């Protein structure tokens, strides 16, 4: 008799792809992951597909108002999705999957505007084209429903972090060091999960490295390690209302962009480039540490994901800043919890697609400030 595969415990169980291109805009991270009710997610494959400089330039240009935006945005979205499709095909090949084995692709898109205070957030994407190129269902536009419910639409990863990284009896913080830094506070016993954006991270570090090294990022923090933190400049950088704002809050390149940095540096033209890089590293560390001290002072363990997890100088700066803020927490990457740091964000959007398929909420209203928990996303059938 032919073998019968057991029915999934939950109708949404199965294999999903997650795609995430963040504020660093260097490329797209992808994962193929199996979700099964009652079990930890199982990653079947991962991939990274870089963006050509022409696409990066187009995406950076769209961060600020300009001429002919609709045409430029549409063309950039098509070019972006072409790279997403390459990532999906690589995941499919590596995992040895047929299209019919993939339940859906959860894709974030590329944020070009984030203005929740004005009632909108804009992630550049063309999910209909991605569905056509992959012949797989696509779930996208995760942030809009939260914004429609009065929330910030960000961060969305905390609900996933709580599912995967929470531990009874231990308060943990998960810190994503992407273009922007954000934290998720996971209470060990009782209390609400909280999370919010802290400030700039790789967005400004990469920008400064590109200007002065001609490279897309400061590899291993070596450029910063050659410099010394300039205390008056650090104070000037921290003199930004966002850092003092209470959560829920979210930010992005709308605020922390090259123009913001140049305006702050105007009074510090004598500071050497390597010292600026060291000071930007300290800015990231201090802005995170202050938020942890204020909202999770009892935290004993902080786990880092995102591109910053590969920067030992930044991690050391974070340890120092936490100590200075009176937080006695160990600092490690999420690899210590079994999830490589470069996979976490893409996994979160695969999980959001899984939640959408089961018509279950993907946000946490206590994190985003929305009127309630909502099912997030929109389906583009293959």
From Swiss-Prot:
- Please verify whether the record's keywords include Kinase: yes
Instruction: Drop me one GO molecular function for this one.
Output: ATP binding
Q: Could you give a single Gene Ontology term from the biological process aspect? A: 1,6-anhydro-N-acetyl-beta-muramic acid catabolic process
EC no.? 2.7.1.170
Which HAMAP family does this entry report, sorted A to Z? AnhMurNAc_kinase (MF_01270)
PANTHER family reported in the protein's UniProt record: ANHYDRO-N-ACETYLMURAMIC ACID KINASE
Tell me what this protein is called: Anhydro-N-acetylmuramic acid kinase
Taxonomic source organism: Burkholderia ambifaria (strain ATCC BAA-244 / DSM 16087 / CCUG 44356 / LMG 19182 / AMMD)
Q: Which gene encodes it?
A: anmK
């Amino acid at each position: 008799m032919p073998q019968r595969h057991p029915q999934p415990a939950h109708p949404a169980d199965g294999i999903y792809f997650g795609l995430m291109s963040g504020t660093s805009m260097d490329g797209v991270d992808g994962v193929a992951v199996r979700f099964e009710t009652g079990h930890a997610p199982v990653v079947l494959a991962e991939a990274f597909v870089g963006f050509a400089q022409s696409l990066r330039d187009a995406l950076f240009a769209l961060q600020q108002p300009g001429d002919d935006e609709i045409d430029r945005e549409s063309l950039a979205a098509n070019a972006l999705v072409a790279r997403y499709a390459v990532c999906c095909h690589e995941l499919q090949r590596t995992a040895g999957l047929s299209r019919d084995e993939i339940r859906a692709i959860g894709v974030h898109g590329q944020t070009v505007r984030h203005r929740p205070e004005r009632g909108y957030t804009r992630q550049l994407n063309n999910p209909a084209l991605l569905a056509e190129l992959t012949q797989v269902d696509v779930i996208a536009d995760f942030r809009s429903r939260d914004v429609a419910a009065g929330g910030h639409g960000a961060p969305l990863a905390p609900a996933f972090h709580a599912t995967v990284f929470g531990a009874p009896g231990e308060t943990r913080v998960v810190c994503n060091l992407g273009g922007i830094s954000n934290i998720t506070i996971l209470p060990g016993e009782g209390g609400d999960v909280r999370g919010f954006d802290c400030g700039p991270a790789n967005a400004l570090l990469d920008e400064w490295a590109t200007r002065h090294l001609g490279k897309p990022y400061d590899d291993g923090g070596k450029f910063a390690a050659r410099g010394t933190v300039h205390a008056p400049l650090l104070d000037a950088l921290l003199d930004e209302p966002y850092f003092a704002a209470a959560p829920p809050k979210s930010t992005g390149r709308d605020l922390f962009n090259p123009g913001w940095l140049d305006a702050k540096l105007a009074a510090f033209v004598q500071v050497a480039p390597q010292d600026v890089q060291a000071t930007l590293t300290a800015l990231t560390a201090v802005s995170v540490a202050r938020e942890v001290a204020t909202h999770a002072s009892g935290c004993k363990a902080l786990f880092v994901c995102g591109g910053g997890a590969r920067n030992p100088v930044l991690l050391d700066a974070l340890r120092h800043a936490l100590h200075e803020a009176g937080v006695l927490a160990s600092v490690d990457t999420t690899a210590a919890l079994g999830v490589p740091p470069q996979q976490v964000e893409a996994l979160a959007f695969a999980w959001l697609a899984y939640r959408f398929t089961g018509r279950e909420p993907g946000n946490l209203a206590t994190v985003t400030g929305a009127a309630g928990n909502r099912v997030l996303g929109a389906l583009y059938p293959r």
